[in-house]
């Protein structure tokens, strides 16, 4: 087995994985940068004084890491200090542009630089992208190969084999990084030894299923899910010829790649067959060849290098096939037949043709799985089940009674003291709401932030024949589960499950949009309480398009364990000077959501422990917590955006969300995130024209998300590639 793996790797994989890095000469730092440092930085970071042991009086283009730190400090508003003279907005923008040019020109020595990492797209200041009208005409993305997503890899395996045994026996070779947010970036992943070993084993599993057969009634027959052409070649009485190998390779190419192999490829696979058949087992040799087709780069990566001669600006347009694959995997987890048919017929040659077919594909279904996938990664609500919590909790008004019962509810308890925590159901409800808004496809972002409707404890009953689906209850009470605990509808503020959905939120327990969905609130909480810091950071990064400094090494980010105080009171420790320079970007954005518990339940007051009363209560000699109500402070503030219409105090989460939804900046930042998801990279200053046009198209279409996607997928930045 190991010998065959080495043969496959040397014949098929190795030639495709060899890459050559190109580097450019580093330009000298220009006079403008030196002047800026001398004027605004050197007094505290020069020969006479080195605050933080940082010396900038001789900073040059060779000091790339130092320049990165300077850029981050200036971009985040941490330097110059407030008490020092501040550069004008125009000068600051110009300086950041110059630094970006120098840092980009410096290269990365094969390493992925910070500005290319997911969740670091905001390193490009918003003003550089939307501050002034950008000229269009030369947009392009870097030429690249992009590893398949886990879902797309499964789809590729499904094209190769229809056997049910395959899907359950494959190991995922292409797992994404375990971080929140948009994670499938082209430059982030590469082939390594463990990945290669998994791919080889998976290929063997797929081919075994393709070739699976048995002798029955004296005849060699295929098993369910096998490929007839391959099964015939596994017949013990058949001698496999070169012509059989050529036909089998062509069949595998058709299944996996929708391509015909070239003469050179056919010759290479014949040579591989001959090498493997030297031990006399020609059937096993053929299986190795079929595995090799599954292991070639085209089966596991998307190639985006462009075709033909480069234009005057060094751009090459994606070939029709490259474009068909790029469009397919932008909108789906598998190849979309319409795109490949259009490529075969020469109907992906112009931007107008691409726009027509993209619109047609988007209009055929309620929503593409990749469209919903964007919102899942953007809002980060789907991680709610990963936040471990007790599976039941006391009703706000019956918390002390619930604590006494300790979750034990005999049949004679006729009333509800608590409610169930069912995070998987909460995620389904939120996704149903997003799909509903996407189906309407108007003013999408505003509705996502401010809608007063929701789905509750929903399950879809699908009638495939009639192509309809109806809402039913996911959780239903019965004699075994109707003891002391309310159904999941309680979390949303309903007294009973609403039959007509999406239902309007009860006015006495209001909530707006995704940020007040229980799934989002739970996903942005801790095991036992709310997390204003995480919620505020999400708003700062995903809606305001700014960055939050990373937690310094050696700092223990903890608040006092004082359950007899409110969370806001306990968080006063973050106002300390050494903490506040980071927390000022997050806390006041997250604290208004104290309107809800960490289970996502609306509340009018905050329950805290009453130490004195708790000392007097016990159950079977075990102490019992007793709670008292404290006044709820729901105020907050938006700061440091540079937009006077956005900055300022808010009285509660509702005012906060409405102000964000009304903001032009928030809409533009949303467009930036959509760009990252569909392009698999962070935006750069060169993408300003693409982003501005996408934003205009979104506004002029009354907030159509489909129109926004069409704008991006028909932009020059999507259609053209440029060698770096």
Language-model features, listed with the residues they occupy:
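Active-site-adjacent structural elements in folded domains
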Residues: 234-239, 256, 273, 307-314, ...
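Extended surface/linker regions that mediate inter-domain or inter-protein docking
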Residues: 98, 112, 123-244, 252, ...
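Aromatic- and Gly/Pro-enriched helix-to-coil junctions and flexible linker segments
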Residues: 20-230, 255, 259-271, 275, ...
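Short secondary-structure boundary/capping segments
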Residues: 306-312, 391-394, 464, 595-600, ...
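Sequence context surrounding c-type heme c attachment/ligation sites in exported
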Residues: 21-93, 504-653, 657-661, 667, ...
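Bacterial N-terminal signal peptides
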Residues: 5-16
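Soluble non-cytosolic domains of exported or imported proteins
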Residues: 27, 31, 86-90, 239-247, ...
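N-terminal secretory signal peptides that target proteins for export/translocation
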Residues: 1-3
């Amino acid at each position: 087995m190991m010998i065959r793996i080495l043969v496959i790797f040397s014949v098929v994989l190795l030639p495709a994985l060899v890459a050559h890095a190109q580097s450019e000469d580093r330009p000298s730092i220009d006079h403008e940068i030196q002047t800026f440092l001398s004027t605004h930085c050197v007094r505290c970071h020069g020969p006479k004084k080195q605050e933080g042991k940082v010396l900038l009086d001789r900073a040059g283009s060779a000091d790339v890491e130092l320049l990165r730190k300077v850029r981050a400090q200036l971009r985040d508003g941490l330097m110059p200090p407030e008490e020092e003279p501040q550069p004008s907005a125009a000068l600051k923008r110009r300086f950041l542009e110059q630094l970006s040019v120098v840092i980009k020109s410096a290269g990365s020595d094969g390493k992925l630089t910070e500005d290319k990492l997911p969740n670091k797209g905001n390193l490009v200041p918003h003003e550089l992208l939307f501050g002034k009208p950008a000229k269009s005409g030369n947009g392009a993305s870097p030429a690249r190969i992009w590893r398949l997503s886990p879902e797309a890899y499964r789809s590729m395996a499904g094209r190769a084999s229809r056997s049910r045994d395959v899907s359950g026996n494959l190991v995922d070779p292409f797992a994404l990084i375990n971080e929140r947010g948009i994670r499938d970036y082209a430059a982030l992943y590469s082939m390594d030894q463990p990945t290669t070993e998994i791919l080889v084993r998976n290929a063997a599993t797929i081919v075994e299923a393709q070739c699976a057969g048995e002798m029955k009634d004296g005849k060699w027959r295929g098993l369910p899910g096998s490929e007839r052409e391959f099964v015939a070649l596994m017949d013990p009485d058949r001698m496999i010829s070169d012509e059989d190998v050529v036909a089998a390779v062509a069949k595998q190419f058709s299944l996996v790649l929708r391509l015909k192999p070239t003469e050179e490829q056919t010759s290479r696979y014949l040579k591989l067959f001959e090498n493997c058949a030297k031990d006399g087992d020609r059937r096993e040799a053929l299986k190795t060849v079929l595995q090799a087709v599954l292991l070639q780069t085209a089966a596991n990566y998307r190639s985006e290098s462009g075709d033909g001669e480069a234009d005057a600006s060094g751009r090459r347009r994606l070939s029709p096939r490259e474009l068909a694959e790029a469009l397919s995997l932008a909108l789906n987890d598998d190849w979309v037949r319409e795109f490949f048919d259009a490529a075969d017929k020469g109907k992906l040659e112009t931007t107008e043709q691409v726009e027509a077919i993209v619109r047609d594909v988007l209009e055929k279904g309620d929503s593409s799985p990749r469209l919903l996938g964007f919102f899942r990664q953007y809002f980060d609500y789907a991680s709610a089940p990963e936040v471990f919590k007790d599976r039941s909790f006391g009703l706000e008004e019956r918390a002390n009674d619930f604590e006494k019962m300790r979750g034990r509810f005999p049949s004679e308890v006729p009333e509800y003291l608590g409610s169930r925590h069912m995070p998987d159901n909460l995620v389904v409800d939120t996704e149903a709401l997003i799909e509903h808004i996407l189906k309407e496809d108007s003013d999408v972002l505003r509705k996502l932030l401010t809608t007063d409707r929701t789905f509750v404890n929903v399950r879809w009953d699908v009638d495939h024949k009639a192509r309809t689906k109806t809402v039913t209850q996911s959780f239903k009470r019965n004699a075994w589960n109707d003891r002391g605990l309310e159904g999941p509808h309680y979390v949303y503020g309903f007294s009973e499950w609403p039959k007509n959905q999406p239902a309007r939120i009860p006015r006495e327990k209001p909530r707006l949009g995704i940020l007040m969905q229980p799934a989002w609130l739970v996903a942005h909480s801790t095991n036992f309480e709310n997390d204003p810091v995480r919620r505020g950071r999400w708003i700062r990064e995903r809606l305001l398009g700014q960055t939050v400094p990373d937690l310094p090494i050696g700092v223990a980010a903890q608040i006092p364990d004082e359950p007899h105080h409110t969370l806001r009171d306990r968080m006063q420790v973050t106002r300390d000077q050494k903490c506040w320079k980071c927390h000022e970007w997050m806390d006041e954005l997250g604290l208004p959501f104290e309107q809800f518990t960490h289970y996502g339940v609306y509340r009018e007051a905050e329950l805290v422990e009453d130490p004195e009363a708790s000392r007097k209560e016990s159950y079977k000699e075990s102490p019992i917590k007793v709670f008292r109500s404290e006044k709820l402070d729901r105020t907050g503030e938006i700061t440091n955006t540079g937009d006077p219409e956005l900055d300022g105090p808010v009285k509660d989460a509702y005012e906060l969300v409405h102000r964000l939804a009304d903001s032009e900046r928030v809409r533009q930042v949303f467009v930036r995130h959509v760009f990252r998801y569909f392009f698999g990279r962070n935006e750069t200053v060169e993408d300003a024209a693409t982003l501005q046009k996408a934003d205009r198209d979104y506004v002029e279409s009354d907030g159509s998300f489909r129109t926004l996607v069409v704008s991006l997928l028909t932009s020059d930045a999507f259609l053209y590639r440029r060698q770096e």
